[in-house]
Each structure stands twice: as C-alpha cells, then as structure tokens.
C-alpha cells in the first residue's frame, strides 16, 4: 500500500477543489491511503471525502513560518509516507515533507522550492486553472496528460439523510419556504483572480 501525505490548502474553495486530486489518486493508485495535513476547520470537509483516510491538524496558522515547529511536525511523521503532494505554492509548505524524509515530494514551482521537492512541476501556464494543477499532481511527469485531455473528477461531499433533513429544515425556517422546495446555491466567483473562478 502506498501512503500519501497531502499538504492541504488553507481556503475552503481550494480544499473542495483538492477533492478532484484525491479521486484521481485513488483511481491511479487504488490501494493508496491518503492523509491530509490542513487547518483544523477543514476536518468536517475532509471527513466527507471518502478517499481521505485521516485529516491531520496543521497547528500553525496561515502565513506563520515557525521553522522549529514545522521540523517537529515533520519529524513526527517520519517513516509513515511514500509520497507527499504539496498543494500550496509557498516555500514553508514544503518543509514538513522534507523534515519527514518522505522520498517522493511533488508540487508546483514556487518560492524557490527547488531543493525541497523531488518532483517539481514548472509548467503552470499549461494548466491555467487551480483544479487542473491539483489533478496534474496525481500523475507522474512522464504520464501527465495535457490540460485539454486531463480528466477532472467532480468534487462532492458525502452526506447522510439526517443531515440533509436538518439542512432543509434550517433553510425552510431561514428563507421561509417549504422544506420540499428545491434550493440551489452557486458560488462562481473568486476573491483573488481567474484561476479559481468557474469557467464561463
């Protein structure tokens, strides 16, 4: 069995997009186990992604460098993983897999990470959408399809009937509509540019 550590993103939309990567990994490596290191608030999302074995809490806040703490976390993860995939582009996000001595460390070029990642991807322009970049990391370099040929599994969350009923009841109260009335929400925008917007 291949054990994979994902250094997850810190934003809800990015975390949802990362589910396409987890599905890709499970298709390519059916027996793999995927653990995701991410902020604590991500645990409820990750718990609803069936491909994720464990959601590990990243105790450091977004933007905190804290090299000694990153070393401690990395050391605690030694001898547990065969591959790490680093989704954020920051230099500091590549430290934990390095300190964990994970042999295959894959990610996109960013912030001088040349010596920290063993499988560095440099052709970001060929994959203009963030979800394409995430899914591309599920492939070895020599097997990587072009962006046009890249299959992107749709992200989804597993929910149970009780939760659906509770949500319908809550929406019915809040928006004064019948519980059996369909409700649809769309969030096509992005705060920081076109890479994360829905295609149009």
Predicted ranges, named:
Residues 1-200:
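Catalytic machinery of carbohydrate-active enzymes
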